[in-house]
Amino acid sequence: MSARHSTTALPRRFSRTLLACALLPLGLLAANMATAAPLQAQPAATAADNFGPLKHVNAGVLDVAYVEQGPADGPVVILLHGWPYDIHSFEQVAPALAAKGYRVLVPYVRGYGQTRFLSAATPRNAQPSALASDVIAFMDALHIQRAVLAGFDWGARTADIVSALWPERVKALVSVSGYLISSQEAAKAPLPPSAELQWWYQYYFATARGQAGYEKNRHAFAKLIWQTASPKWAFDDATFERSAKALDNPDQVVITVHNYRWRLGLAQGETRYDPLEAKLASFPSIGVPTITLEGDANGAPHPPAEAYAQRFTGKYEYRLISGGIGHNLPQEAPQAFTQAVVDADHL
């Protein structure tokens, strides 16, 4: 079930504390937004891979591996995964959208799966504007002018950024956990101890020990994140291992570590992205039609909906998805996610 609210139903006046939650990556606090008694989490999907063969396209600095479903002339939807997940988060969403006539594209992010850098000389950079630029390059390579963007975790942040910086390329947006645009300057602000604790892995990755630990224990590390971010999701080992294979990418560790170090100002990006990061540091509004989603059992740090509602200035809805739904919302609640994509497209 989902609780649906229009933008007018959300408060337009909020405190500095709530605003600060929206400005840091994935927010600062885990908010309890459930409106009913928790229900049992949905069982994990079968481990059978229904995606079919991967396609590849050279896009910008990458050889992007992606899945495509649906009619070639259908309206385009691009689904963006997060960390430490992969394209199988959308295994049920993609065919459902394809059945409705959409051309669905699900790319592996740089550093995941079969996506590869075209040159060994390219910096293994994972700053937010670089990931967003990858989406634009992917669209350009496939001659796609506009698309509906939908994502969670890193994918939601990337979709937010593309929508803010290139709104002419985005028909509509679906973002789990809302407005996730941030800056290195905003990340300098210390958080309450309980909030800092939720970001333990970010600080772990800031150390040489953390990088070595992730390199040595990629799958075990990812499983721990899955369990804490979705505490009521009963995924099985086969489901997890299918996605965990994407973390065997040779650039996975350096990409993940760079992403989190960059957020804290501990790693540099590329100067060519400086103009984009400067725009993002002003926390631009998003004017494209948008639906934001939240699971009622999201164990990852995330901002309350009231903290970011004002950032969406176009047609907007917020939906709380109940039933013990955690951070990997498209895989845990595929019907709700699919419906949000269709509805956002028609806002």
Question: What kind of region is each of these model predictions?
Answer:
Residues 37-51, 61-64, 69, 76, ...:
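Flexible "cap/lid" subdomain of the alpha/beta-hydrolase fold that forms the substrate-access gate
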Residues 68-117, 308:
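Conserved HGGG/HGGXW glycine-rich cap/lid loop of the alpha/beta-hydrolase fold
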Residues 55-59:
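Short acidic-hydrophobic surface loop/beta-edge motif
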Residues 18-32:
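Bacterial N-terminal signal peptides
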Residues 132, 257, 334-338, 342:
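Short, amphipathic alpha-helical "lid/cap" segments that border enzyme active or binding sites
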Residues 325-333:
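Catalytic histidine-centered segment of alpha/beta-hydrolase-like enzymes
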Residues 82, 153, 331-332:
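Conserved acidic functional residues
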